[in-house]
């Protein structure tokens, strides 16, 4: 079952390690004429990091491409980022990352003096257009690399959920209701062996449910 990670010391140390690797990635990309900026997203950014029993913890980062030679050459961008990230990982005695459809994921990382908890980094490559819309770089793999597709896929607008979360936090005690409900939702899906609802979807559901409950009670 999922539980919140309460060890603040570990979280601070792990996120510092992850951010250090991401900063090195930024520097490496700059040498390849790619200007980028990373930021922590997901449960790590919301201080809602969960762990399923003793399974590894994931820290999600977005790597925003600010400028490069050709923003539309998605394959070149993905490959340059992947190669640069692998170089950074090797320089830190870590294994190469895995390349999935929408992210680059490190192998499991652990501290030698605290090996009970493993963690990994998921890096999504994103960019923002002049209208403020966010796009995620996706890599659809064919049965061989010749048929692979690389493209920018527009991400759902999360502004309205941020506004709802802000409204909930303005009422004392109600954010704890969101935290509990979020954990309940994740565990309900886990009991059903439903792995089609990622953490962000569970978070949106929790925010919507609590926000609607507060509206019905005329708290908002």
For each feature predicted by the language model, list its residue ranges.
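Conserved catalytic core of two-metal-ion nucleotidyltransferases
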Residues: 29-32, 78-131
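Right-hand nucleic-acid polymerase module
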Residues: 100, 113-220
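Short glycine-rich, low-complexity/disordered patches
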Residues: 24-41, 90-107, 191-205, 214-220
């Amino acid at each position: 079952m999922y539980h919140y990670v309460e060890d603040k010391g570990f979280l601070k140390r792990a996120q510092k390690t992850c951010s250090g690797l991401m900063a090195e990635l930024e520097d490496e990309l700059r040498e390849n004429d790619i200007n980028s900026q990373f930021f922590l997203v997901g449960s790590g950014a919301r201080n809602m990091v969960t762990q399923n029993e003793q399974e590894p913890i994931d820290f999600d980062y977005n790597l925003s491409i600010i400028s490069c030679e050709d923003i539309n050459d998605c394959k070149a961008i993905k490959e340059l980022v992947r190669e640069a990230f692998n170089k950074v990982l090797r320089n830190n005695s870590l294994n190469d990352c895995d390349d999935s459809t929408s992210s680059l994921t490190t192998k499991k990382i652990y501290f030698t003096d605290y090996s009970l908890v493993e963690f990994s980094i998921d890096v999504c490559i994103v960019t923002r257009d002049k209208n403020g819309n966010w796009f995620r770089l996706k890599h659809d793999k064919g049965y061989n690399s010749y048929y692979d597709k690389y493209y920018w896929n527009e991400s759902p607008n999360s502004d309205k959920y941020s506004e709802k979360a802000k409204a909930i936090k303005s009422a004392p005690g109600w954010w704890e209701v969101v935290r509990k409900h979020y954990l309940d939702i994740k565990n309900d899906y886990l009991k059903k062996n439903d792995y089609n609802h990622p953490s962000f979807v569970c978070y949106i559901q929790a925010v919507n449910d609590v926000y609607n409950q507060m509206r019905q009670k005329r708290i908002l």
